[in-house]
Curated annotation (Swiss-Prot):
The keyword Membrane applies. It holds the Pfam family ECF-ribofla_trS. This is UPF0397 protein LLNZ_01795. HAMAP family: UPF0397. GO terms for cellular component: plasma membrane.
Amino acid sequence: MKNNSVKIVVATGIGAALFVIIGWLINIPTPIPNTSIQLQYAVLALFSALFGPLAGFLIGFIGHALKDSFLYGAPWWTWVLGSGLMGLFLGFGVKRESLTQGIFGNKEIIRFNIVQFLANVVVWGLIAPIGDILVYSEPANKVFTQGVVAGLVNALTIAVAGTLLLKLYAATRTKSGTLDKE
């Protein structure tokens, strides 16, 4: 258990740092204000799959809070929570044991993408906008538009780049029973 907690702490630090750096360097704007294509969610998917839902939550939450603080001066807490929840849900989208054994085929890809799509819909289409209305008194039409666009572009980003990262990772793992004794 202690070894696992050390892995989670290290993964959280590295993952949060990558979340900040990628979010800072690769930020592709959309026509909707304050909404952009964010490639760090693909990395969040990889780390969440490898280290579990808790690490995923911490990486998303801490990474987003730091990114907002560095780029905008203060975190937008409802969306910071959203990133944490995305990491949490993404951690449930992949069977970690299978992935570390090199198994990430069509069945696993479909499962992962169903989970990530539903998570994006719930987090960015409902939780973050409702939080913006309740916490920041933002106009509903504005925040739901931002949430829907963010959810769609994040779902697409994770479907393409996140799936690719997971597939590439699985390809580096040796499947059990594939080594022969000579």
